[in-house]
Amino acid sequence: MYKRQAYDLTTGKSFSEALEKQGKAFPSILINMIKASEMTGELPETLDDMEEYFAETEATRKAMVTAMIYPVIILIIALGVGTFIMLFVVPRFVDIYKTMDGADIPGITLAVLALSDFLQKYILWILVGIVFFLLIFLYLYKNVKSFKTGVQWLVMHTPVFGNVVIYNEVTMFSKTFASLLAHNVFITDSMEILDKVSNNEIYKQLIHNAINNIAKGKSISTAFKDQWAFPIPAYEMIVTGEKTGQLPEMMNKVAAYYQDLHKNAVARIKTFIEPILIILLTVMVGVIVLSIVVPMFNMYSAIQA
């Protein structure tokens, strides 16, 4: 790939053209930034800015992934432990309880025994069903726009996690937009790049609205007015940037503000969700164990009496 770029440069092509010929190997934002800097003679500064930009966006992305995946991992571990107990621990007590015909066995114990028996019979079908569901879900998410939009809408309206997604999207939008404007990329081109960069269909629609507004001679900010997915403070800062002619600077301030909110939201998730899930795991395992063990102690106490 790099040899082809070197060859393109020796044949008289510009650096941006050489990168563009590599297809999707290089992000569109990088290519357009370089294209603009070639006209202004600021290529070294632009490359330094891009290095910082991609480092910051990668850090934000990792924080976002951590916030969304960490609770899921803890929940999967909890379900795995519970399933293991049901499949390999509880069955060892079944024969004992079968000898207790007529004994007063608590309802919760009977429920645990019934659930254990159900899992032993159908665990393979349950696992196949889960895998099948995940495959169908991923296929629809990748290939059906309306389904993807619906899932993203649902996640963004979920307590706690919704704000994390919104803060992340606003941060990425503002940071990218500010960087494009600061390097003299045209607003319409900037919006088209933002559309390609974003993976959120709801924000893509906002960007499309902004492009249409620009074509009609309207301001960019009107596309973000009264939109639940775009916080009011961010909208007001865009309006201020348009009125003062300092839109790049204001977008940087928006990015910095919502990046801090995003970091705080991720920290809160780690702080509150972890103990809640640990308590859930403890309660689940405790209920299963006590429902099996306590009746046995009662039985032995009755025999000794």
Question: Would you name each region that the model predicts?
Answer:
Residues 7-10:
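Alpha-helical, low-charge segments enriched in small hydrophobic residues
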Residues 36, 42-236, 240, 246-305:
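Low-polarity contexts
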Residues 1-5:
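Conserved small/polar residues in nucleotide/adenosyl-binding loops
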